[in-house]
Every structure is written in C-alpha cells, then in structure tokens.
Amino acid sequence: MSFEVFEKLEAKVQQAIDTITLLQMEIEELKEQNNALSQDVQAAAGSREALVRENEQLKEEQVVWQERLRALLGKMEEV
C-alpha cells in the first residue's frame, strides 16, 4: 500500500515539475514578445518624433509661402 502511495506522490510531483517547466517556457516566450513589443514602441516613438519635426517644418514653410502670396496679392492690387 505504501508503494502505491509513493507512486501517486511521484506522479503528482512529476506533473508539478512538468507544469512548472511549461510555465517557465511560456514566461520566456512572453518575455521575448514583450521585448519585441518594446522595440516596436521605441521605433514608433522615433517615427512619431520625426513626423512631428517634419510637421513643424512644413507649417513654417506654409507660413513663409502665405506671406509671399499675400505680398504678391498686395502688389497685384497696387497695379
């Protein structure tokens, strides 16, 4: 009878070890996914910063062109 109890205990211990091993593998996969997502976030942040700078530059260019256009329209009205 004690041998049967020992076998059941051994089976439960082995099942616990298998579960722990699977969970460790899952944790490693999730860590890899997390790292990949972190890199994606950093890349997106860099792209966003570049787009913000480009947007500011384009706004400045628009202001310059609007001023030139107003000046030309003013000259045309004088004529």
Curated annotation (Swiss-Prot):
GO terms for cellular component: cytoplasm. It is found in: Cytoplasm. The keyword Ribosomal protein does not apply. Keywords: Cell cycle, Cell division, Coiled coil, Cytoplasm, Septation. InterPro entries: Cell_div_ZapB. GO terms for biological process: division septum assembly; FtsZ-dependent cytokinesis. It comes from the Bacteria. Its main location: cytoplasm. Residues 4-78 form a coiled coil. HAMAP family: ZapB (MF_01196). Non-essential, abundant cell division factor that is required for proper Z-ring formation. It is recruited early to the divisome by direct interaction with FtsZ, stimulating Z-ring assembly and thereby promoting cell division earlier in the cell cycle. Its recruitment to the Z-ring requires functional FtsA or ZipA. Homodimer. The ends of the coiled-coil dimer bind to each other, forming polymers. Interacts with FtsZ. Belongs to the ZapB family. This is Cell division protein ZapB. The gene is zapB.
